[in-house]
Curated annotation (Swiss-Prot):
Acts on phosphatidylinositol (PtdIns) in the first committed step in the production of the second messenger inositol-1,4,5-trisphosphate. Necessary for proper organization of the trans-Golgi network (TGN) and post-Golgi secretion in root hairs. Together with PI4KB1, required during polarized root hair expansion and pollen tube elongation. Functions redundantly with PI4KB1 upstream of the cold response phosphoinositide-dependent phospholipase C (PI-PLC) pathway. It is found in: Cell membrane; Golgi apparatus, trans-Golgi network; Cytoplasmic vesicle membrane. SUPFAM superfamilies: ARM repeat (SSF48371), Protein kinase-like (PK-like) (SSF56112). Disruption phenotype: When associated with PI4KB1 disruption: aberrant root hair morphologies, and short and wavy pollen tubes. Residues 1-143 form the PIK helical domain. Residues 394-404 have a biased composition (Basic and acidic residues). This is Phosphatidylinositol 4-kinase beta 2. The gene is PI4KB2.
Length: 1116
């Protein structure tokens, strides 16, 4: 009991403050029961799947915090595979650490940020907590735009500085370079420090002027100053006081030995400040020289003055109309007015500027005797402290604007204290402090308006963070020491000036008046793994391009989806096509405009691409009863990558649970040599490494090459355990041995095919008998013709309408111009590569590097989140088969959910549905006819196409059984150019079915025309490829059982989502688990798979559903 209380106390204390687990020993010492979990997370087995699954199973904040910290080490491509589940958990199982992780990865990848936005948008439309989801969505948007780390889609072009803001642009560019230098490693030598011509180069490669070069050289800090600024994150509070002296000694050090250069620089400073014409240069030089004598007597040492202040103060203090002459003639009076104290004079709007020069060049006669005795104090509290010093007891007095346009400098009304409230007091005013109303300038005073606009932007660059104001106010009220530390010019000020990326999120303009981010208990501390990168500035061009790309990409996808939604109400079909063409033309015009704001990201596929055009003649309207999906081609350009970007070979590999994307980019491994039937084995694979034992290869080869002439075959299966020995057991019959493990005591599945002993010689089938014979079941083609004939007479079977609702009857008829299918004909009418070359030749972007063509389907009106889940599960089955080395073939595709009723779907090139193949070619009445015409019967390519068909049939049959995928008519079955079959459209799975009636009760679709391709028939006639199909189904099912929890848990995470497939409630997950038959032995599982195949052989319900689709929707 005491131990339990102690553990609970420890857990309670850990929730009070954010935690960051740096070593596993800390958590192990807190709770011994969690030690194994931490060791598991730190092992090499840790991956994206483990992270997501344990985030779902564990509610403890400590476990979640540790998992989120560990997820930072995982690749973004793997995280993107489970982004759908992560966003769902973030909404329905909230955690501060998970929120922060999602926000951080949004800052690293534009595609992830876009997908997070769309996933949250879909949840926002279904959830009651709209405010909470909107808040997270806005934070992700800020992270992706203002503090994004991803490279812009286009290289930002340097904008030329306008004549009205040369001074400000010069300062901004110098300040940005100063930030990058102070935050770069001191050991790196930049070209900017070189005295050669390389130092005169700007970012775009253009030459700097001589004045600009001097300004920049003066702003470059020494390596010691950079070292002092780099320690800001690691310094403790107790070390701040002792390090401050050294910090400002280095920052304000004297540059002795440069008196001549300083004198020339300062002399040039006031020459340009008060210059009227060339004849007055000598007089102004003498005045400025006398001024510096007074300055040196008050300070005791010389401070370096940068020439950057030349143009700045000249613009700040000059009059807008012809005041340069008056400045030249009355320069002596200017300095008298500049340096005198006037406590009883009226205060004018420009008193702040005059107060600045008073503070900057104030004569302090009382300090003449202290110059030699307090050198260190002068270095610490000298120039910059006077320059940036801030007064807290602020007085607000009304000001009046002088009616004339001839005066620039006015007299002061405030005393010595108000005189200090000058230029930099206004510059460093807090962000949330009320701004006094000084008055309005005259309409003709254009320079005053220009000055105020630039001044507000200049002050915003150095604004103080609101949290700093909150933390410094108590100390300011308590003692004067707090004022010294937090006022501008001190070390704390500079530490806050170069604040972290996380602070700049809250300081952004888009964050507005929203609440600042609260640190919730249990959230991990922010990690700063890249201190050498310069912090992003909200005003630079790269940030503007990121913001533009993010919003333009969202608008682009929204316009595509809304087009599909609006086409529903347009009739007839010709008007619908015209409207779609006009909409595409309008989107193309928007694409051209988006090029100036950063470009539009193509959100699908592997890699980062920028959308440049949509060919207007390449759209296709797809057949649908109630919706109007359409297919388009999109021209894209590969996004520009920064120099030095690492390219790894891992990008070509499929991640765990990843989806092969982007129209043929799927990296599908070739099957091992033992997967080939003996008669079709290719020579190229004979020398490759074998993945299974020799006995397994021999057994499968024997099973595949066995030509049985008996009509009925009995299958006898048994599981045997053999010790590791070199002896081989030989059976008298035809024996197939399947290896199921690699342990020392191996388990073998023995498959024996024997003829029925009751058969006589007369029962032996004649080998010359035609392969496709008629049998007791009515052929699909004959039955369909009978139904069509009855419909023509006004008769129809019960429950079937005479015509498809809303469908053109021409869909069921062969094409008028359809010819005979030949071996070289493209299934889709045109090969994808030929289409790609044709469009590239006609496109104005075709000659640009990185050009590519993508094809997508835009769909609206359906919630495609269930289809996204189905494709994700198929990708997991794909990984399971690949890891086991099995040749079962699957082709996942990408479904990108953009809302609860819209989605973008990847198209699979060079494919066509069985329905479209039969409709296009009159000579094709069955799938066997298609194979005979396409691949030439009995040719090597025909055998290879048969093998591809069997491998894909076995893979999809298991998936359809385990996930209970329904609505398997020929419109949802595709064929590719290599003979693979591909399933699409997973709107009915797990517990729902078309019409709410489970009419398709067979485990999977295995009709006669599918069996004919495997040289079998509706009775299950044994053949080489049909036996191969059985073996693959047995191997695949035994392998899937080992990963059952991986599939079940992925589905269980979303069981409360309200998807149609979960309408069965908790029984949905229970039935899914039952279909894996985890309680059966492997021998029993073999018999189970064979019984599933037998139950699916040309099942009556499956055939009747095909008849129904043919009559109702014209699907052949």
């Amino acid at each position: 009991m005491q131990m339990a209380q102690f553990l609970s106390l420890v857990r309670g204390d850990s929730i009070e403050s954010p935690r960051e687990i740096t070593s596993p020993s800390n958590l192990i010492s807190e709770s011994g029961s969690n030690g194994w979990l931490i060791r598991f997370f730190d092992s090499s087995f840790f991956c994206e799947w483990i992270a997501v699954s344990y985030l779902y199973k564990h509610q403890h904040s400590g476990v979640r915090d540790y998992l989120c910290n560990r997820m930072y080490t995982l690749p973004l491509s793997g995280i993107e595979s489970y982004l759908f589940q992560i966003c769902y958990l973030m909404v329905h199982k909230p955690s501060p650490s998970l929120d922060k992780f999602v926000i951080d990865i949004c800052a690293k990848s534009l595609k992830i940020a876009l997908k997070v936005h769309w996933f949250l948008l879909a949840e926002l439309e279904d959830s009651d907590d709209n405010e909470g989801i909107s808040r997270i969505q806005e934070k992700c948007q800020i992270a992706a735009t203002l503090v994004g780390e991803w490279s812009p889609l286009m290289r930002p072009h340097n904008e030329p500085s306008t004549p009205g803001s040369k001074v400000l642009n010069k300062f901004l560019s110098s300040k940005q370079k100063l930030f990058s230098l102070t935050l770069s490693p001191p050991t790196q030598k930049s070209l900017l420090f070189s005295p050669t011509s390389g130092s005169n180069l700007q970012d775009d490669g253009s030459q700097l002027s001589a004045d600009d070069n001097k300004i920049f050289k003066r702003l470059i800090p020494s390596p010691k100053v950079r070292d002092a600024l780099l320690f800001r994150k690691s310094a403790d509070k107790e070390d701040e006081e002792c390090e401050k002296d050294g910090f400002f000694k280095r920052l304000l050090r004297d540059s002795r030995g440069e008196d001549d250069e300083q004198r020339s620089n300062s002399e040039g400073f006031f020459k340009r400040l008060l210059k009227d014409n060339k004849s007055e240069e000598e007089e102004i030089s003498n005045n400025s020289e006398g001024f510096f004598k007074r300055l040196r007597s008050s300070k005791g040492d010389e401070e370096e003055l940068t020439s950057s202040s030349d143009g700045f103060f000249k613009r700040l203090l000059r009059d807008n109309k012809g005041d340069e002459e008056e400045l030249g003639a009355n320069s002596e009076g200017f300095f008298k007015k500049l340096l005198r104290d006037s406590k009883n004079e009226d205060e004018e709007p420009n008193a702040n500027t005059e107060g600045f020069f008073k503070k900057l060049f104030h004569e302090s006669k009382n300090e003449d005797d202290k110059v030699s005795n307090a050198v260190d104090d002068e270095e610490k509290d000298g120039f910059l402290k006077k320059l940036f010093k801030e007064k807290f007891d602020e007085k607000r007095n009304g000001n009046e604007r002088n009616e004339t346009d001839e005066t620039v400098y006015t007299d002061e009304t405030s005393g010595e204290d108000n005189g200090r409230e000058g230029f930099f007091k206004k510059l460093f005013k807090e962000k949330f402090e009320d701004k006094p109303n000084i008055g309005k300038a005259d309409d003709g005073n254009e320079s005053e308006d220009d000055e105020s606009s630039e001044f507000s932007l200049f002050r915003r660059l150095f604004r103080r963070h609101p949290e700093d104001v909150k933390t410094t106010l108590p100390s300011e009220n308590c003692s004067n020491g707090g004022f010294v530390e937090s006022s501008p010019g001190t070390e704390n000020f500079f530490r806050k000036l170069f604040r972290d990326r996380d602070r700049s999120v809250e300081d952004s303009e888009l964050f507005g008046s929203k609440k600042y981010k609260e640190k919730c208990p249990g959230s991990p501390k922010p990690q700063n793994n890249t201190p050498s990168k310069k912090p992003p500035l909200p005003n630079n061009t790269a940030a503007q391009f990121r913001k533009g790309s993010y919003h333009e990409s969202l608008e682009f996808v929204h316009a595509l989806c809304e087009t599909s939604y609006d086409l529903v109400d347009i009739f007839p079909i010709e008007d619908r096509k015209t409207a779609l063409r006009e909409s595409i033309a309008e989107i193309n015009s928007h694409l051209a405009q988006a090029e100036t704001t950063g470009g539009i990201c193509f959100p699908m596929g592997r890699g980062v691409y920028r959308v440049v055009n949509i060919p207007e003649d390449e759209y296709v309207l797809l057949n649908s009863r109630e919706k109007v999906p359409y297919m388009i081609c999109v021209e894209v350009l590969k996004a520009e990558t920064p120099c030095g970007a690492k390219t790894t070979s891992t990008s070509l590999k499929l991640s765990k649970g990843g989806i092969p994307l982007a129209n043929g980019d799927a990296f599908l491994h070739k099957p091992p040599p033992w997967a080939y039937p003996l008669s079709t084995a290719q020579e190229v694979y004979r020398n490759s490494a074998d993945r299974m034992s020799l006995s397994t290869v021999e057994a499968i080869d024997q099973a595949m090459t066995h030509k049985s002439e008996v009509k009925l075959v009995n299958a006898c299966l048994s599981v045997e355990t053999h010790s590791n020995s070199n002896t081989k057991s030989v059976s008298s019959g035809v024996t197939g041995v399947l290896r199921t493990g690699l342990e020392s005591d191996l388990e073998w599945v023995r498959l024996v095919l024997t003829a029925d002993p009751g058969l006589r010689m007369e029962s032996i089938t004649d080998p010359k008998t035609p392969r496709r014979k008629e049998h007791r079941r009515v052929s699909s083609i004959v039955a369909y013709e009978e139904v069509r004939a009855a419909a023509a007479k006004g008769e129809a079977p019960p429950g079937l309408p005479l015509k498809g609702a809303g469908q053109d009857s021409s869909d069921a008829q062969p094409m008028a111009n359809g010819g005979m299918l030949k071996a070289g004909d493209a299934l889709s009418g045109e090969f994808w590569e030929g289409k790609r070359l044709r469009i590239r030749k006609d496109s104005i972007y075709g000659n640009l590097p990185g050009w590519d063509l993508r094809s997508i389907i835009v769909k609206s009106g359906d919630d495609c989140r269930q289809e996204h889940l189905a494709v994700q599960l198929i990708s997991h089955f794909f990984d399971i088969f690949q890891e086991a080395g099995l040749p079962l073939w699957l082709r996942p595709y990408e479904v990108l959910v953009t809302s609860s009723y819209t989605a973008l779907i990847e198209t699979i090139p060079d494919t066509a549905s069985i329905h479209s193949i039969k409709s296009r070619y009159p000579n094709i009445t069955s799938l066997r006819d298609f194979f005979d015409a396409k691949f030439k019967e009995n040719s090597p390519s025909f055998k290879l196409a048969q093998r591809n068909f069997v491998e894909s049939m076995a893979g999809y049959s298991l998936v359809c059984y385990l996930l209970q995928i329904k609505d398997r008519h020929n419109g949802n079955l595709l064929m590719d150019e290599e003979g693979h079959i591909i399933h699409i459209d997973f709107g009915f799975m797990l517990s729902n079915s078309p019409g709410g009636v489970n009419f398709e009760s067979a485990p999977f679709k295995l009709t006669r025309e599918l069996l004919e391709v495997m040289d079998s028939d509706a009775e299950g006639l044994p053949s080489e490829f049909f036996d191969y199909f059985k073996v693959l189904c047995i191997q695949g099912f035994l392998t899937c059982r080992k990963h059952a929890e991986r599939i079940i848990l992925l589905v269980e995470m979303l069981q409360d989502s309200g998807f149609p497939c979960f309408k069965g409630g908790p029984r949905t997950i229970q039935n899914l688990r039952k279909r894996f038959h985890l309680s059966l032995t492997e021998e029993q599982c073999v018999s189970l798979v064979l019984s599933l195949i037998s139950s699916s052989l040309d099942a009556w319900r499956t055939r009747q559903y095909d008849y129904y689709q043919r009559v109702l929707n014209g699907i052949r």
